[in-house]
């Protein structure tokens, strides 16, 4: 893993859940509980059966939704509306985060396996929705999820990232296996370190350029090392 970051970027691509907000906030725990609840209610499974189905679908398809669509023919819109129907009082206006994002050179995007509606609610709650050029959600990728390589091809096209701009683009994500396709395409990659994803990290460490405990730490490193638009400034990761 590289220890010196000395590029400025034209495109900053951010995952949403557990990346834009800290995994410690606990919001995704509530979403996870809703996923299990949905499977229990719609497929008439016990909690244990539902969790087993979740695990199997995630391992096989990379996203629980994809597996449920293919093997159980569930309605994806109904599913997304159900699992994202959670309150998020833990998310508040983040003035410093907004300033840090605003100070980044280049364009900023959200690339998520969740829905656009969910993404907009999260960004709005944190007061940072205006910092992003575009959101690419699971519906816009025709339900082809990360880490499917086809999803990344759709992402590059959707964000208008040309082949000669890929190496000037960076992807920040908490799910380590989702960084591999981005790295293979030529993007720089940043992993938001978390215990939930350690096994994936071990399997995909070679595809990760930098790792940080949270987004604020990553952006603070850029700020304190005097990031200047149009110039290359080096900084070390934590």
Task: Annotate each predicted stretch with a short phrase.
Residues 1-9, 116, 120-238:
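Asp-based, Mg2+/Mn2+-dependent phosphohydrolase catalytic module
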Residues 3-96, 117:
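N-terminal helical cap/lid subdomain that shapes the substrate entry/recognition surface
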Residues 22, 110-112, 191:
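Hydrophobic residues in well-ordered beta-strands that form the structural core
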Residues 47-49, 102-107, 163-165:
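Short, surface-exposed connector motifs at secondary-structure boundaries
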Residues 67, 100-103, 181:
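Well-formed, non-transmembrane alpha-helical positions, independent of function
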Residues 78-89, 97-126, 132-138:
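Substrate-recognition element of Asp-dependent hydrolases with the DxDx(T/V) motif
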Residues 93, 111, 144:
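Residue-level marker of regulatory loop/turn positions in helix-turn-helix DNA-binding domains and
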């Amino acid at each position: 893993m590289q220890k010196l970051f000395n590029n400025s970027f034209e495109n900053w691509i951010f995952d949403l859940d557990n990346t834009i907000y800290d995994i410690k906030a606990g919001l995704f725990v509530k979403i996870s509980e809703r996923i299990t609840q949905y499977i229990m209610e719609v497929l008439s499974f016990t909690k244990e059966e539902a969790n087993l189905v979740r695990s199997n679908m995630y391992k096989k398809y990379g996203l629980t939704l994809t597996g449920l669509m293919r093997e159980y023919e569930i309605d994806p819109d109904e599913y997304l509306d159900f699992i994202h129907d959670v309150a998020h009082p833990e998310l508040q206006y983040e003035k410093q985060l907004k300033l840090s994002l605003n100070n980044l050179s280049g364009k900023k995007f959200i690339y998520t396996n969740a829905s656009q509606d969910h993404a907009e609610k999260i960004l709005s709650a944190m007061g940072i929705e205006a910092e992003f050029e575009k959101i690419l959600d699971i519906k816009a990728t025709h339900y082809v999820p990360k880490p499917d390589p086809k999803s990344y091809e759709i992402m590059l096209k959707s964000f208008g990232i040309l082949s000669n701009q890929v190496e000037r683009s960076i992807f920040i994500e908490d799910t380590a296996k989702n960084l591999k396709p981005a790295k293979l395409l030529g993007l720089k990659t940043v992993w938001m370190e978390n215990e939930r994803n350690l096994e994936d990290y071990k399997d995909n460490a070679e595809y990760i350029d930098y790792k940080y405990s949270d987004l604020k730490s990553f952006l603070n490193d850029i700020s304190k090392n005097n990031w200047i638009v149009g110039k290359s400034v080096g900084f070390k990761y934590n």
